[in-house]
Amino acid sequence: VYVLKTESSFPFLQEEILKSEDAEVPFEIGREEEAIQKAYNIFKEKIDQSLAEYLSNKEQTAEDNTKDAADWLSMLRDTVFDLNLILVTLDSEDDAYLIFETLNTRGKDLALADLLRNHFAKLIKAASEVDQVKQKWSKVQDTIKSSPVQLDPDTFIVHSWQSRYDFATKAKVFHKVKDTVNKKNAKSHLDRFVSDAEQWRSIFDTDYLWSKAEKEASRSLAALRTFKVVQPAPGILSLVRAYRDKQIKYRALRNALSNIEKFHFSFNAVTSSRSSGGISGMYSSFGRSIFEADDSSIAAQAIADLVGKLRDREVPAVEFDAGFQQVIYTNKHSSQKTLVQYILKKVAIH
């Protein structure tokens, strides 16, 4: 029987958890390892508490207490040994992928990232000892999870897809991918996710990939984080991608981001306006326009169209003034501290 051993938590699980002696192999601790350590500590704490209760029983002798504790440990061990392992033997590798997806519909939902990795693995067969899908998908995950900013791989996948193809919710993206990605185009789609991962991270982690000469663009992105706005992400991803691919100039990127920043400052940060619908779809549509643009003039027109749509949605001056008067920061009212800091920095710059 072939057993696939986990590598994501290797060698932490083997050295720190399963081994009774001190660890001999150095390892790095990430979020997965922290979760494993937390689970281990919970079990250990509960076992220690139960043993302490047996050993502190004052109604019988210490010898009887020790015997009861040993019997309880034996019972616990036997319970673990009595766990059943279900072995499923399949005729082909494709059947394994099918079962993987079928089980997902019966129990707890798997992460979108896991489903996509499985889909790519089914379509792209390893031509050598190097597992192309495994290496590339690990790069996607590492790029996102190594960010000091808390980022979600599933959200990245949704934004990447919306920026290129169509506006689909997280629940529908996997079905869209399955309908679009086949054996002929799987490699190119996988490569797109790999390249998009870095650009997407730089939208939220503004210390990543941005140079000092690009500080105005990174400031606008940092401002959107201050406003806690994620709706523009698909459109911004296409903008950053086009800039990195030298399809648009830095000036075009900077001006587009500045207009997006100004709109959401008044619409979200100051007035907390509610969208009547369509803003997320608008940014997704804009992202696709940039993605499909054959030259810089078409991209420039797409940016101009977006700026026009943002102006059409501008908050009336009366509403802005009323909202701005409510922006305060004191020792007792500190929830808007970052917004007040943003406003003061803007005043200082200008």
Regions found by a protein language model. Give the residues of each.
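Active-site-proximal helix-loop elements at catalytic-domain edges
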Residues: 346
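Histidine-centered catalytic micro-motifs used for acid/base chemistry in nuclease
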Residues: 350
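Glycine- and hydrophobic-rich flexible loops that cap the catalytic core of alpha/beta enzyme folds
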Residues: 1-167
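A cross-family structural signal marking well-folded subdomains
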Residues: 57-62, 84, 113-343
